[in-house]
């Protein structure tokens, strides 16, 4: 129903403010009585992080920031959903306007600044869930925090019991200084403190790390080396980029500050994914995100090293029908032994290609 209505609503969505359009989409999912999708083909099933996913396609963080509609998103047919980013204390984020469409590029620039209703509000919503389905939570530090690592620890303790996985988001370009946590010393302390908190709380929640696409090879080497020496469960590659490719057509909007997402970051994020996969060598799973706008894109991410994929920006332009197109493509491409058999088979080619 929601997918069928999108073509009718698309002209309206395209002319109103981008953030208002996003808010309307969330409200529609809150209000509409969506029927659950039918079961996925068994060939789409994936096991990762010790969890069984009905299909490998997830809704990326950024859509359901305050965990208002995780079950509605799952009913659309996603294999999992990641809510957030969530901060320890409520914060308004950056001043509006802070979201900008680049329709000629099928891209978006955002500088939300981790606007969040806060940890306690999200905890209360998730505690009321009764529906089965895999939900992850993207965790972020408050802009004015004096102990950002302490924020992640508190978020894990509070929200961990209500999620199958949490993501340590240290790669948002819109919180000043947050990407500094990708440096080796900060990252070691972050992982040590959060993983120690998980162990002491006896939580089964998986802990993932989300990195930026703008890392150079030496920075990536450091991050992977630190991660592999600790019981981290996986990585998400990658967040939005601060780069502005010369190929962008919406030149005026491209001048806006913030993180670029959508089709233009598909290649650089997939190259980064492949390079990460070659360094990790299968020791933990990877989620590939960035620029997926078709079934072929999702398949390419898997062949570059992703066990699971996520998308969001392309849905703004193509609507929820894109999800079924992606699943149909993956189902057709899956060998008899399933999608895990093709993970990483093109990683070396991607890693050696130019961004």
Regions found by a protein language model. Give the residues of each.
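C-terminal helical cap(s) of enzyme catalytic domains, especially alpha/beta-barrels
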Residues: 90-106, 244-258, 314-341
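Glycine-rich phosphate-binding active-site loops on the catalytic face of alpha/beta enzymes
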Residues: 77-91, 170-172, 234-244, 291-292, ...
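Glycine/Thr-rich beta-alpha phosphate-binding loop at enzyme active sites
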Residues: 26, 30-32, 37-39, 173-186, ...
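A gly/proline- and charged-residue-enriched helix-loop-helix capping module
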Residues: 84-131
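Short beta-strand/loop segments at the ligand-binding rim of alpha/beta enzyme cores
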Residues: 52-58, 131-139, 200-215, 277-288
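An N-cap/entry alpha-helix motif that binds or orients negatively charged groups
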Residues: 3-46, 110-112
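Active-site glycine- and acidic-residue-rich loops that bind
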Residues: 141-153, 180, 186, 209-229
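Catalytic cores of alpha/beta
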Residues: 66-73, 153-154, 215-229, 278-282, ...
């Amino acid at each position: 129903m929601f997918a069928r209505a999108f073509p009718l609503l698309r002209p309206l969505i395209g002319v109103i403010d981008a953030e208002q359009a996003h808010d309307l989409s969330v409200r529609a999912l809150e209000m509409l009585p969506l029927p659950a999708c039918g079961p996925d083909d068994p060939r789409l099933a994936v096991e990762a992080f010790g969890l069984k996913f009905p299909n490998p396609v997830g809704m990326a963080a950024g859509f359901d920031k305050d965990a208002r509609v995780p079950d509605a998103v799952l009913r659309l047919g996603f294999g999992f959903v990641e809510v957030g980013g969530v901060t320890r204390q409520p914060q308004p984020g950056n001043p509006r306007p802070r979201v900008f469409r680049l329709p000629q590029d099928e891209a978006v620039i955002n500088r939300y600044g981790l606007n969040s209703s806060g940890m306690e509000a999200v905890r209360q919503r998730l505690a009321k869930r009764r529906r089965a389905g895999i939900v992850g939570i993207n965790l972020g530090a408050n802009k004015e925090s004096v102990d950002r690592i302490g924020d992640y620890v508190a978020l894990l303790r509070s929200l961990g019991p209500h999620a199958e996985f949490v993501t340590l988001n240290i790669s948002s370009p819109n919180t000043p200084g947050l990407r500094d946590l990708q440096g080796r010393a900060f990252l070691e302390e972050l992982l040590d403190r959060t993983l120690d908190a998980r162990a002491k709380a006896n939580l089964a929640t998986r802990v993932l790390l989300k990195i930026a696409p703008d890392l150079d090879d030496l920075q990536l080497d450091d991050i992977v080396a630190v991660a592999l020496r600790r019981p981290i469960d996986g990585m998400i590659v990658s967040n939005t980029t601060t780069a502005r490719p010369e190929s962008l057509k919406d030149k005026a909007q491209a001048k806006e500050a913030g993180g670029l997402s959508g089709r233009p970051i598909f290649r650089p994020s997939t190259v980064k994914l492949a390079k990460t996969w070659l360094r990790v060598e299968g020791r933990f799973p990877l989620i590939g995100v960035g620029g997926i706008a078709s079934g072929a894109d999702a398949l390419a991410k898997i062949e570059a090293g992703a066990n699971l994929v996520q998308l969001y920006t392309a849905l703004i332009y193509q609507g929820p029908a894109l999800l079924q197109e992606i699943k149909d493509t993956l189902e057709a491409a899956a060998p008899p032994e399933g999608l895990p058999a093709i993970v990483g088979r093109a990683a070396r080619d991607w890693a050696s290609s130019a961004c």
